[in-house]
Every structure is written in structure tokens, then in C-alpha cells.
Regions:
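Short, threonine-centered small-residue motifs that mark membrane-proximal processing/anchoring sites
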Residues: 2-25, 217-245
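Short, surface-exposed polybasic-aromatic patches that bind anionic ligands, especially phosphate groups
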Residues: 24-225
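C-terminal membrane-anchoring or membrane-association module
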Residues: 245-252
Length: 252
């Protein structure tokens, strides 16, 4: 299924040219930032971007929460739980974020890796038990809704592993991304999620967005699909946009 909001944004950009600007959102992170979900304090070791070798940091891993506002180029409906409950995970270990901080983000509809979507699909499979995607009660955004801080920590670590591990392996104990000092429950959830990679369906590209900022941690969150309208409707939209451009050119 295609995502209509991305389609119409693309059509508008192609048709209107310079009239189109990047989609943005302002996020105020909760204080504490793990409000309602909790976290696990762990050690992570990763490649040093500025020199040879690696860096090791002691960090809190878990799902972030905040409030969104000042939308430009997107509608509030693209955020699964609304702007007052904006759930997300860190997608950038080389920057930082603080409790209560305000950050202006660019909404990126193609900022995540396929490997990340594979992991999140595995998370959904575990979190939904034996339910299928069409079953009543199935949560397609279960990865955004951890029930405990240990679940959230395991999801966050898997997201980092999906992005920063240079090999195809899924092993937090070795490689270019390493995590240690996990609580036992975090390890249990990580192993459960890892065990479903490859046997569960990856998330579709349209189901995930990233929030990007060059100076602060990028975030990753969910993006609910919107059905594409009938071809006749799309043709009318394209024609209207083309007419808008033509009118502006005549005025110029």
C-alpha cells in the first residue's frame, strides 16, 4: 500500500517546484524523557567517527516521549498517538538530547534503513504474540508501545544495532556496535526480538519516519498509512496543482 500523504507531498514538490519546502516539527521532550515507559542503563561501544578505534558510553536506553507542535508541510495525523503523546526512539548515537529540551526537526520519510525495518517487524511479531496483522487487537505500532522499560531498552538497542553494526549479524556482544551491562529482562527481550528476525515480515517503508537535526539526536517513529485515492482523484489533484503553477507563472 502506498502512503497518500507522501505521494501528495511529492506531487506538490514536483509540480510546484520552488514553492515546496521541507516538512518540519518542533518537539519538546518530556522531563523525564522516558516518561511512562522507563529505561535500562547500559554500556555501548561504537566506532569513533573522528578518530581510529571506538568510543564507549554509559547511556540510558529506552523509548522517548515528547510533545509536537509548529508543524509545517505535514498534518498531525501522521503521528500515531497524536502530538501530545509523541513516542520515538533515538536513531543517532553521535549526538545528544536532554530531558525537557526543545528541538526543531525535519521530517524524513525515507531516513531509516531496511535493516531497521526488519528488526521492528520482528519486534511487532513478538509483541503481538500469535496474532496476525488482520486480527482484532493487533497493534501495528507495538514497537512504539513497550509495556516495560526493559522492552523499550531492548527495542532501542536493536534499533542501534540495526543502524551501526557493519556486519549482517545480530549480536550485541561483538562487532562495530556492542552493548553490555544489560539487565536480565532486557537481555531476554532482546533475544526474543532477535529470534524473530528473518521469520517475520519487515515493516513497510511508509510505516516509519525519522526526525532529523544536524546538531541533536535524530529520532525514529511510526507513520500510519493513508489509502491512496482513486486514480481520477489523483488526476484532479495533479491538474489543480499544475493550474496553480500556471497561474503563478502568468502573474510573473
Amino acid at each position: 500500500m502506498a502512503n497518500f500523504k507522501r505521494f501528495i507531498f511529492t506531487i506538490a514538490c514536483v509540480t510546484a517546484g520552488s514553492f515546496c519546502s521541507a516538512a518540519t516539527i518542533q518537539v519538546v521532550f518530556d522531563n523525564p524523557i522516558f516518561m511512562g515507559s522507563g529505561s535500562d542503563n547500559v554500556n555501548i561501544t561504537f566506532t569513533n567517527p573522528n578518530a581510529a578505534g571506538t568510543l564507549t558510553e554509559y547511556v540510558a536506553a529506552g523509548r522517548f516521549q515528547g510533545t509536537g507542535s509548529n508543524l509545517q508541510g505535514v498534518q498531525a495525523g501522521i503521528f500515531v498517538d497524536g502530538l501530545n503523546d509523541l513516542f520515538m526512539y533515538c536513531y543517532d548515537i553521535y549526538q545528544s538530547i536532554n530531558h525537557g529540551q526543545t528541538v526543531d526537526y525535519t521530517v524524513n520519510f525515507d531516513g531509516e534503513l531496511a535493516r531497521t525495518r526488519s528488526f521492528l517487524g520482528a519486534v511487532n511479531a513478538v509483541m503481538n504474540g500469535n496474532m496476525l496483522s488482520g486480527d482484532a487487537g493487533y497493534d501495528p505500532y507495538a514497537w512504539l508501545h513497550p509495556k516495560t522499560g526493559y522492552q523499550g531498552a531492548a527495542i532501542q538497542l536493536g534499533i542501534w544495532e540495526s543502524k551501526y553494526e557493519s556486519s549482517s549479524d545480530w549480536d550485541l556482544g561483538t562487532g562495530s556496535f556492542v552493548a553490555s551491562a544489560l539487565e536480565a529482562e532486557t537481555t531476554t527481550w532482546w533475544n526474543s526480538f532477535k529470534g524473530r528476525i528473518g521469520s517475520s515480515q519487515a515493516l513497510d517503508d511508509f510505516a516509519v519516519i525519522t526526525l532529523d537535526n544536524p546538531n541533536y539526536q535524530d529520532m525514529i517513529t511510526a507513520d500510519p498509512p493513508i489509502n491512496v485515492p482513486e486514480p481520477g482523484t489523483l488526476a484532479l489533484v495533479a491538474a489543480a496543482l499544475a493550474g496553480l503553477v500556471g497561474a503563478r507563472r502568468k502573474k510573473a
